[in-house]
Structure formats: C-alpha cells, structure tokens
C-alpha cells in the first residue's frame, strides 16, 4: 500500500539526505531544503506531524542523541520498492566496465576479478560476482566499506565482516537475500549466462548505501556481460 504524496515526499527526502550525510534529518532541514525548493506548502509543525506519523508507522526512527529522524529497514525498503529512480551510470564507470568485459577472450577468472575490483572501487561497497552453479565468488572492497561511520563501532564491523564471509560461503543464499539482509544493505542482480550458468552481481554495505547508484551500475555490468559474452552464441 502506497503512502500519500506528502509522506512520500518527506520519506524520499529523508532517505536521500541521510544517505548523503549520515546525519538524522530535522523538520527544519526538510522545510529549508525540500519545501522551499519545491514550493510546497507546510509549516514546521505540519512537517513534524508527518514525520511523527512515519515514525509511528515504522518508516523512521529517532536516534537517542538527535532531534532528527533516520530511515528504518522498512523505510529503506519502501524507498527501494517505490521511490528509487535508476538511470544510466556515469560515463567513467561505463567505460571502465566496457573495457573489462571486452577482454573476455583472456582468462575469465582474471576478468571477473578485475570487474569485482572496479565495482568495489566505484561504489565503495563490498562488491563482486558469484556463480551459483560452481559455488564460487569474486568479491572485493571490504576495507573501503569499513571506513563508513556505521562501522566505527567494532562489533558492527565484526558483524559485517562475518556477513561478507557468509556471502563467500553461501552463494545461493546471496541470490535470495533481501535489500535489508541481516541489518545491512544488499543490491544484487541474478542472470543466466550461456557459459557460466546462473550468476549474481552484488554490492553490500551499510543500510545507508546509495541504492540508486548501486542498482544502475550492477544492472549495467550484468547487461554488459550478457551482451558481450553471449554474442558469440547469437
């Protein structure tokens, strides 16, 4: 069931702003950045009331030390399912992926390893490609992810490291993971390849990850693989 327009506008702004800043979002910031920019009517009291309703409905929560709100798992899921806009990745990463995939005549393992490193470097997330039929995976980027503020607490960093280990040991489980798996964010695309069978390209990180950017890059990489790898079978 969809939220009404005002709630969607505010939830969309909070998710995007929190992804970009890692700071809880106040009603004053919404009034300044969203309502003035889009010329929407609404007093700070009205905005606070809508935020409270989103909080009570489970889309937002209030961190103990802040007057602002941040998205919950439910809030992120609603954003991904209903509000996210996926366009083409920027030219730089498209060019990089094209060059990597064009080298499929070389050793496939080295190409997939380079692809995983490129995804991890661009997205700053634990990223890679796995092969479900073979039960193997190429994944990189854990050190970069652990620089995010969510992982400054050692126990959270350890949990995420364990999470990535579980990905390495359970490729089929990765293909079935939801966007908010185990308290972390996951973006993935499963596709079929003529030579390698069922494959999954993925990125994983904190829930406060850029889902639009990750989705656009992963979809482009999967399309690139299918287009270039399968054209010899066409």
Q: Where are the predicted features?
A:
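Alpha-helical hairpin
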Residues: 2-3, 42, 71, 89
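Short acidic (Asp/Glu) and glycine-rich catalytic loops that position anionic groups and cofactors
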Residues: 11, 55-58, 197-198
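Short alpha-helical segments that sit at the start of domains
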Residues: 1-13
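N-terminal helix-turn-helix
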Residues: 20, 24-82
